[in-house]
């Protein structure tokens, strides 16, 4: 049984068992983010989907207008002039066979992997290593592309890839505790729109089941989904 710390008990006591208006929830999460570092703010969204069916899966990207506040380390697998192009665009790592070899050995000092289409047959062989970590490049996520310059700049600026896990829950970071409540809310609205826009064709019944936000070291707070929808229309 997991022991709950006195700090977490104290913070959890501030959160009522109810769904909050979006801005109120964000302010409460920020108030509880009192660790000695700039905590990441995350959203955990339960959707009415069963990802074991291909027509109920969601995997896409979203460009957060206020960014994520987090430095993203990007690796690029390409060859020839594309390697130089990736480096000039700000990739942290770029290469061909040597990078593939280091990844196969478990050396993955990056948060995102981009590949050019011609390298995907070789990258596919790294599935056992990349797959469990959610790092396999995918065209739907914008990580298989010939336009390396645009892709790298977009992901560095705050573009995020997200997907639902096996339970149909999407986990996404959308800012830092140091962000203003208004900036966090703007990012959350854009995330909400992206999930709606990419609703799987096989989704049945109520699409949005629940939405909780939390900081790295704080308790979760439920957001009133209807209120979030209303705030988007204001």
Swiss-Prot record:
SUPFAM superfamilies: Ribosomal protein L1 (SSF56808). InterPro entries: Ribosom_uL1_bac-type (IPR005878), Ribosomal_uL1 (IPR002143), Ribosomal_uL1-like (IPR023674), Ribosomal_uL1/biogenesis (IPR028364), Ribosomal_uL1_3-a/b-sand (IPR016095), Ribosomal_uL1_CS (IPR023673). Keywords: Repressor, Ribonucleoprotein, Ribosomal protein, RNA-binding, rRNA-binding, Translation regulation, tRNA-binding. It holds the Pfam family Ribosomal_L1. PANTHER family: 54S RIBOSOMAL PROTEIN L1, MITOCHONDRIAL (PTHR36427), LARGE RIBOSOMAL SUBUNIT PROTEIN UL1M (PTHR36427:SF3). Part of the 50S ribosomal subunit. Binds directly to 23S rRNA. The L1 stalk is quite mobile in the ribosome, and is involved in E site tRNA release. This is Large ribosomal subunit protein uL1. It comes from Prochlorococcus marinus (strain SARG / CCMP1375 / SS120). The gene is rplA.
């Amino acid at each position: 049984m997991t022991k709950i710390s006195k700090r977490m008990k104290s913070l959890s006591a501030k959160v009522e068992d109810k769904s909050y208006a979006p801005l109120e929830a964000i302010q409460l999460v920020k108030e509880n983010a009192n660790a000695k570092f700039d905590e990441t703010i995350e959203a955990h969204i339960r959707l009415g989907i069963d990802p074991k069916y291909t027509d109920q899966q969601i995997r896409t990207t979203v460009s957060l207008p206020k960014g994520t506040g987090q430095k993203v380390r990007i690796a690029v697998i390409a060859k020839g002039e594309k390697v130089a192009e990736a480096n000039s665009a700000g990739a942290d790592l770029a290469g061909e066979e040597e990078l593939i070899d280091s990844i196969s050995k478990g050396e993955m000092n990056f948060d995102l992997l981009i590949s050019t289409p011609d390298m995907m047959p070789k990258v596919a062989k790294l599935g056992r290593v990349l797959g469990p970590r959610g790092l396999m490049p995918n065209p739907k996520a914008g990580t298989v592309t010939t336009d390396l310059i645009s892709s790298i700049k977009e992901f560095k600026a705050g573009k995020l890839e997200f997907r639902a896990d096996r339970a149909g829950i999407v986990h996404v970071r959308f800012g830092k505790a140091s962000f203003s409540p208004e900036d966090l809310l703007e990012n959350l609205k854009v995330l909400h729109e992206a999930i709606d826009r990419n609703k799987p064709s096989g989704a049945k019944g109520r699409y949005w089941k629940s939405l909780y936000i939390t900081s790295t070291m704080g308790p979760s707070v439920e957001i009133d989904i209807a209120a979030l929808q209303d705030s988007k229309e204001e």
